[in-house]
């Protein structure tokens, strides 16, 4: 008897344990009975908020959905700007489940991979459209914040964008099919949502960010070569200007040297002329005071200059006036 009571107590405890489930903070729970979702009066799946809840053991199971903000990294992709220039854009998306019932039905049981595939394709389509309306300068500077904001709003609202928007019908069709599935599951009791928006999947895009923007390899090399050519042209221009300035300085220096030498030569000639004139004046004054003595001195200097040379032979007439002071010393008095 005692063993039976213990067994019953154990069974009751196990049943109670299996009848209780806890939805953690940051999660939501959806109950399935025999594999089918429990629904409310509007035929929408029942969603359990965080807390302690009960279920029928062995009959009902609970599917947990993550209510936290999810981050989805996008592979760097090539986009074309308004200027028909290619850019490699690396980005990520932050999203969360805004309508758990719709999300569960639209994704075929809360399949996060299916939701992210649709979100990624729609995001790529929307980002391609926005980048196609901007030039490179707007994308990499002031317009980046506005660009991501417009992409986020377009994803949430389902905006069709401008006439030149590049669309991916497959993604939109998949979202539209998911929205139709939700309508069919709920028998039209849920509000109709724009099938082009992510709200049709029960998803809200919280944030869109561009991590980095790069140029394709071939474009980067072309820009590098152009920049190098421009720098080399600037260097050549500076070298040419330097050589021109050097030539100017050398020409100026040569001119100054020539001018200084010419001026010195002119001053020297003037001074020599003045000296010669002064010497001539002195000679003239001396000659006027004693012409005979002056003539005698001049003759002595002539003798000295004549006999100091290397030649030891002089051919002259004996009657030459050159020897008058040698013949007759008194000739100085004539």
From Swiss-Prot:
Annotated transmembrane regions: 3-23
Name of a matching Pfam family: Band_7
Alphabetically ordered keywords of this record: Cell inner membrane, Cell membrane, Membrane, Signal-anchor, Transmembrane, Transmembrane helix
Periplasmic side: 24-334
Domain of life: Bacteria
Keyword Cell membrane: yes
Family matches, as SMART domains: PHB (SM00244)
Assembly description: HflC and HflK interact to form a complex, originally called HflA, now called HflKC. HflKC interacts with FtsH; complex formation is stimulated by ATP, and with YccA.
Entry's family note: Belongs to the band 7/mec-2 family. HflC subfamily.
The protein, known as: Modulator of FtsH protease HflC
Organism: Escherichia coli (strain K12)
This protein's encoding gene: hflC
């Amino acid at each position: 008897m005692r063993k039976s009571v213990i067994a019953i107590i154990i069974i009751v405890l196990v049943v109670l344990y299996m009848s209780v489930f806890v939805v953690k903070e940051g999660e939501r729970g959806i109950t399935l009975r025999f594999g089918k979702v429990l629904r409310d009066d509007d035929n929408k799946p029942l969603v359990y908020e965080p807390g302690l809840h009960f279920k029928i053991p062995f009959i009902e199971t609970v599917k947990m959905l993550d209510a936290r903000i999810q981050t989805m990294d996008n592979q760097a992709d090539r986009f074309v700007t308004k200027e028909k220039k290619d850019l490699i854009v690396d980005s990520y998306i932050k999203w969360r489940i805004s309508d758990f019932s719709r999300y569960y039905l639209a994704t075929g049981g809360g399949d996060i991979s299916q939701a992210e595939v649709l979100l990624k394709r729609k995001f790529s389509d929307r980002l391609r459209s926005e980048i196609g309306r901007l030039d490179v300068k707007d994308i990499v500077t002031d317009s980046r914040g506005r660009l991501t904001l417009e992409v986020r709003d377009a994803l949430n609202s389902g905006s069709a964008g401008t006439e030149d928007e590049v669309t991916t019908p497959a993604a939109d069709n998949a979202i539209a099919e998911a929205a139709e599935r939700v309508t069919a599951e709920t028998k039209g009791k849920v509000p109709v949502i724009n099938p082009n928006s992510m709200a049709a999947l029960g998803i809200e895009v919280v944030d869109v960010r561009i991590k980095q923007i790069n140029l394709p390899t071939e474009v980067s090399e072309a820009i590098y070569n152009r920049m190098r050519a421009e720098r080399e042209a600037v260097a050549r221009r500076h070298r040419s200007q330097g050589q021109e300035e050097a030539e100017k300085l050398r020409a100026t220096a040569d001119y100054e040297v020539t001018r200084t030498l010419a001026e010195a030569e002119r001053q020297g000639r003037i001074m020599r002329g003045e000296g010669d004139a002064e010497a001539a004046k002195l000679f003239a004054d001396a000659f006027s005071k004693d012409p005979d003595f002056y003539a005698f001195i001049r003759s002595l200097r002539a003798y000295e200059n004549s006999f100091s040379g290397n030649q030891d032979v002089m051919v002259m007439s004996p009657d030459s006036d050159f020897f008058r002071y040698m013949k007759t010393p008194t000739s100085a008095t004539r």
